[in-house]
């Protein structure tokens, strides 16, 4: 792929309307374009990053046995009236009518729809548990959309739902998603803290939100610093191991402002371990028992001829928001270097030849290298623009391509100038470079 053939509308400067660095960078390097307030078109660069994030989310959901479905964005109002949330949801819900005058809505969430799907098909406890998820666009009519895709009205989200026969099994399902989210964010190189949270309009009595630290975050958080030393290593998918993992995190104080209790914070956390800062919510999980199954009559047959309403949970990750969250965590605004995790970078390698109309040897060499790396499944782009090498390197630092090969006029035959973003270049052989890149792919 030549950059001259790519649709990457880069701006020279940060747009004045953007207030936080993720919004600034995404507009500047042509990842998104605003369509209307809080609604964006995703251009090739941004869409590519988002799809890579989506795939990591999908893989981690599949690993815990969740099954992917796809529900529509437009939902009938009937099931929302049946659950009692049609009027309760307020002005955030976009209500519409079709040509027959039927009341419809643009889905802000999917508890009602997935419960309707479940109740039409599953009748016996023998079919449980069921873990279903989808990745789809949502719309919530925010009063004041801001910060680009971080607080937009339309957003891309992974929603999962669990259906179990009793509270014990439902807790097991909840803990599976708790574990899955920790693994997902680790693969995205984000330090996400699971925090006790209010259930809000979703309902229920158990909830955690996953927060990453960021100065631009809208959530004020209060936590014990020692929570950052924890991880999910050694955890396996059995009841005790997953319960132990959750308890390990819950032993440390970590809450957002709506759950904050000053006396409890000071009692449980020593002064040297107290951290009060801001963060961005990137995931939220809920257990709400039979709130929706009872309202929508989603019951299964039990042994002995009895029936009972299934126990449910819901589990969300903001896929589009994660694009902005990674930028907030990884973008060095001072030096204009974006350090995407290798697994989600828009390109994995940039080949940067010096362009000379009278000497095509550097471009010819770039083309040969492109074919080599293409055969190794390395996502590569060639900068064939007539610009100086310094400008090209700055451009790829801003876009966030993690590795670069620079072909200047003094390039040696057997050695290549190889540069990791933000570091000094090295002279390496093609085999050495190939090994570095293939090892990076294997890590992810």
Swiss-Prot record:
It holds the Pfam family HGTP_anticodon. The keyword Flavoprotein does not apply. It catalyses: tRNA(Pro) + L-proline + ATP = L-prolyl-tRNA(Pro) + AMP + diphosphate. GO terms for biological process: prolyl-tRNA aminoacylation. It comes from the Bacteria. GO terms for cellular component: cytosol. GO terms for molecular function: ATP binding; proline-tRNA ligase activity. Keywords: Aminoacyl-tRNA synthetase, ATP-binding, Cytoplasm, Ligase, Nucleotide-binding, Protein biosynthesis. Belongs to the class-II aminoacyl-tRNA synthetase family. ProS type 2 subfamily. This is Proline--tRNA ligase. The gene is proS.
